[in-house]
Amino acid sequence: MELVCSSSGVSKQRNTFKLTEPFRSARLIYRAAEPEELEDQKFLTKIQQEPLSYQNANVRLSKPQSSKSGKDYLKFVAEEALIGVIICLPASEEGASHTPIGIIHLDKLAPHITHHRFAEIGLEITTAYQGQGYGSEAIRWVLQFAFLTAGLHRVEIRAVGYNPGAARLYERLGFQREGLIRERLWFGGEWWDEVQLGMLENDWRALQEQETK
């Protein structure tokens, strides 16, 4: 069974978000992050300790990350985000474990502002699996979750100026460039801009209709 949706409320298209498999996409599986699981602790620490992934995914001071940092990040993803999942490649054979390759989450609003119904995407893909379209696939999946399941009206994402390819990717996925904060970030001995992008529920539904024509 697949969930049928349209911007008018009339069933005009069939979305790929399957009710029977809501935590899968074409090539990926999205599983819960487990704060008490040693393997998840190791994986999140590994992501935090990859300099390129770390610098592109957040604007904190770049420095060696401890295992505690990985555990804290895992706890945030599992317990404090609106949704936070580990992105995995399916196991190649029955009984084997899925291969974790990244993490994606929607930040949760504080209780007194939830009526605004927006969230920001956080995404990290391990260096070995970058450049293969997994990040794009995961973003498309989390947008479906945001608008079809969580009932959000708006989803936001940011891109750092020293990673210009990220902003171009987000725009290809349908995000609109909404703001530029000039020279907000200090990195590599230079000042860099931060790009703010957003997508509304109606934007997303229009994209779904275009893809089904």
Question: Where do the model's predicted regions map?
Answer:
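GNAT-family acyltransferases
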Residues: 1-128, 191-192, 196-213
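Conserved acetyl-CoA-binding loop-helix of GNAT-fold acetyltransferases
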Residues: 124, 131-148, 164-172
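Conserved GNAT acetyl-CoA-binding A-motif
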Residues: 148-158
